[in-house]
Amino acid sequence: MQKRLVTRYAMPSAEAADENQRRVEGVFAELAETKPDSVSYIVLRLADDSFVHVSFHNHGDDEVNPIASTAAFAHFQQDHADRRQGGVEQQTAQLVGAYITTID
């Protein structure tokens, strides 16, 4: 079953957002290297320095999340509560439609 998750959170400063972005980029570097199957992952940094993660992945409830199981994601999670402002909002999502060309 394909899981679709949207995660949002705010950052207290541009400096905290810069560090968060570096760690997110590390996750993408590891995903590019390991190339897990059936994974789509997009992270956006908004103008107010908040972040939105959108992930699509196939794994059963008894299987490991292919994104969250990377070493780079573990590094991203370290001190995340201290880097962000407030909590994390995460919801499952239903795909209504998609059109994707090269994203830059």
Predicted regions and their residues:
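Glycine-rich beta-strand-turn "strand-cap" elements at beta-sheet edges
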Residues: 1, 9-11, 38-50, 75-104
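Short, surface-exposed ligand-recognition loops at beta-strand->loop->(often short) alpha-helix junctions
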Residues: 10-22
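Short beta-strand segments enriched in hydrophobic/aromatic residues
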Residues: 11, 24, 45, 57-58
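A short local loop/turn or secondary-structure capping micro-motif enriched for an aromatic residue
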Residues: 14, 60-63, 99
